């Protein structure tokens, strides 16, 4: 999984810093800026990251790439002969870089060096003092308030407040009986209890394979911080479940997708969550990799809208028909047929998948629902194309913070104004570019790995505060076993419980 990464623990500068307009421009290692959570020992993420902003000798920030490999980055543990860390430097093409590194063992006093032509950049070297734990190290911080501060989590999250407002009190005893009776036969559910920072589960329904995503984030959280004792039900299906119009006797169900006609409690999607947990692991598409693969600059992008996907909604059929009528405006095609009969005369041939990064060769990205919300929206936003988003009853955990005409161009749910909106974007190129930039900034600032961990913890913490009785390890529950520790690189947790914590 990480063999290639481990062979190259730093990148050498081989490309000179050139002017953005063609002439020579001097990059200043002293004036360039470095910041981010990956420089804090206590911020444990699957892949830690920080930023570099290139600045010239006049104090002006670069706004385009000074060269892909101008910075040398090395991560090492001075007390160790070999540091088991994978490092990547990602050029965001706007004068800034993301440096991300995944640790496969825990170390003391980790040293992070950033150099330009042999000179240290900003305040390099950075020393992460004390123990620095890797993702698989089971060493939770007992003080959750301290963890929230280190992670720079927000005090409140509006979507969590909205979702939990339906439930002034939660009785674990009651829901443990009623939810399986109401939903357990027809739906796929997981009944979880977190007790003493251990995770227990009982599944309901036939298709419960997606529990792996929920198991993974819960275990990851318990390795990092003392979780509140909490008992909850997670919906593994696509559609939200709690559709009662009245608030009387509704049940709290946690889902990856919400809707305006349901009262489910929304979590970050399994797709986005998995991309965070597996960054620099088994996934290649994540919120950081997209930022280094945004295609040509805006002025050089193809001026057609692009879409690929399967036939999981009627409006997608209409989109492909529109594309066939207006190929100069829209490049939309199906990669798979499953829900509807494939009529090649109407919808054209099935095409091969293209790399997600190739979407960003186009200025305009169409985001249209599948069975529920299209879970690709975070990745589309963090690119540098403008998103045309279909109006929808479905939403992910962050949709309500997005503003139409600021972060994306809205399109009616039946796509009746899609051509009009595309023509507007073509006629208002600078405004469309500004919307693309605002959407990208929103995603950069709100949908990174630390944001996802904060959301989950705050959600479970605030939900736990609503409980009117103690969560229990119910009959039939089994412990979700933690990941087996690597015997070659064992993790020694240096956090000792005080008497007050015992």
UniProtKB/Swiss-Prot annotation:
Query: What span is annotated as the signal peptide, if there is one?
Result: 1-19
Q: Which reactions is this enzyme annotated as catalysing? A: L-seryl-[EGF-like domain protein] + UDP-alpha-D-glucose = 3-O-(beta-D-glucosyl)-L-seryl-[EGF-like domain protein] + UDP + H(+); L-seryl-[EGF-like domain protein] + UDP-alpha-D-xylose = 3-O-(beta-D-xylosyl)-L-seryl-[EGF-like domain protein] + UDP + H(+)
Compartment(s) of residence: Endoplasmic reticulum lumen
GO biological process entries: protein O-linked glycosylation via serine
Q: Name one GO molecular function term.
A: glucosyltransferase activity
Which UniProt keywords are present, listed alphabetically?
Endoplasmic reticulum, Glycoprotein, Glycosyltransferase, Signal, Transferase
- The keyword Iron appears for this protein: no
Please, which domain of life does this record's source organism belong to? Eukaryota
Ranges for the Filamin repeats: 24-130
Entry EC number(s): 2.4.1.-, 2.4.2.-
Enzyme class (EC, first level): transferase
Locate the coiled-coil region(s) and give their ranges: none
Primary localisation category = endoplasmic reticulum
The entry's comment on post-translational modification says: N-glycosylated.
Query: Part of which pathway?
Result: Protein modification; protein glycosylation
Q: Which residues are glycosylated?
A: 302, 414
Q: Which GO terms describe its cellular component?
A: cytosol; endomembrane system; endoplasmic reticulum lumen; nucleoplasm
UniProt motif (Prevents secretion from ER) ranges: 499-502
What is this protein's function per UniProt? Protein glucosyltransferase that catalyzes the transfer of glucose from UDP-glucose to a serine residue within the consensus sequence peptide C-X-N-T-X-G-S-F-X-C. Can also catalyze the transfer of xylose from UDP-xylose but less efficiently. Specifically targets extracellular EGF repeats of proteins such as NOTCH1, NOTCH3, FBN1, FBN2 and LTBP1. May regulate the transport of NOTCH1 and NOTCH3 to the plasma membrane and thereby the Notch signaling pathway.
What does the sequence similarity comment in the record state about its family?
Answer: Belongs to the KDELC family.
What is this protein called in UniProt?
Answer: Protein O-glucosyltransferase 2
User: Source species, please?
Assistant: Homo sapiens
């Amino acid at each position: 999984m990480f063999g290639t990464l481990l062979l190259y623990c730093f990148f050498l500068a081989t490309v000179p810093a050139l002017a953005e307009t063609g002439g020579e421009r001097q990059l200043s290692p002293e004036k360039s800026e470095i910041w981010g959570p990956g420089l804090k020992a206590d911020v444990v993420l699957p892949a830690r990251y920080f930023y570099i902003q290139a600045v010239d000798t006049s104090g002006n920030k670069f706004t385009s790439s000074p060269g892909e490999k101008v910075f040398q980055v090395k991560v090492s543990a001075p007390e160790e002969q070999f540091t088991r860390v994978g490092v990547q430097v990602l050029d965001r093409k706007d004068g800034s870089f993301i440096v991300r590194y995944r640790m496969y063992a825990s170390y003391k006093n980790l040293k992070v060096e950033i150099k330009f032509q042999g000179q240290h950049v900003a305040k390099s070297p950075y020393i992460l003092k004390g123990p620095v734990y890797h993702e698989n190290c089971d060493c939770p911080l007992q003080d959750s308030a301290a963890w929230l501060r280190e992670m720079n989590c927000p005090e409140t999250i509006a979507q969590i407040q909205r979702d939990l407002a339906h439930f002034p009190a939660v009785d674990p005893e009651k829901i443990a009986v009623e939810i399986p009776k109401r939903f357990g036969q027809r739906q796929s559910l997981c009944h979880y209890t977190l007790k003493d920072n251990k995770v227990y589960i009982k599944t309901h329904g036939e298709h419960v394979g997606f529990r792996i995503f929920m198991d993974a984030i819960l275990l990851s959280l318990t390795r990092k911080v003392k979780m509140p004792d909490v008992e909850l039900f997670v919906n593994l299906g696509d559609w939200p479940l709690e559709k009662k119009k009245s608030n009387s006797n509704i049940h709290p169900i946690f889902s990856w997708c919400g809707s305006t006609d349901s009262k489910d409690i929304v979590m970050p999607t399994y797709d986005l969550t998995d991309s965070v947990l597996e960054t620099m692991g088994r996934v290649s598409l994540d919120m950081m990799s997209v930022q280094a693969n945004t295609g040509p600059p805006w002025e050089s992008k193809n001026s057609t809208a692009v879409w690929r996907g399967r036939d999981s909604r009627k409006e997608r059929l209409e989109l492909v028909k529109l594309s066939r009528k207006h190929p100069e405006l829209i490049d939309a095609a199906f990669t798979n047929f499953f829900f509807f009969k494939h009529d090649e005369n109407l919808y054209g041939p099935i095409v091969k998948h293209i790399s997600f990064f190739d979407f960003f060769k186009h200025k305009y990205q169409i985001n249209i629902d599948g069975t529920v919300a299209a879970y690709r929206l975070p990745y589309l936003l963090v690119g540098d194309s403008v998103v045309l988003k279909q109006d929808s009853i479905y939403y992910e955990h962050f949709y309500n913070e997005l503003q139409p005409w600021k972060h994306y161009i809205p399109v009616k749910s039946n796509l009746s104004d899609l051509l009009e909106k595309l023509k507007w974007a073509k006629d208002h190129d600078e405004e469309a570019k500004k919307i693309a930039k605002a959407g990208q900034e929103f995603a950069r600032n709100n949908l990174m790995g630390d944001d996802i961990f904060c959301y989950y913890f705050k959600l479970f913490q605030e939900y736990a505060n609503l409980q009117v009785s103690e969560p229990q390890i119910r009959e039939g529950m089994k412990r979700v076993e933690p990941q087996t520790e690597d015997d070659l690189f064992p993790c020694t947790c240096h956090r000792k419980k005080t008497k007050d914590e015992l």
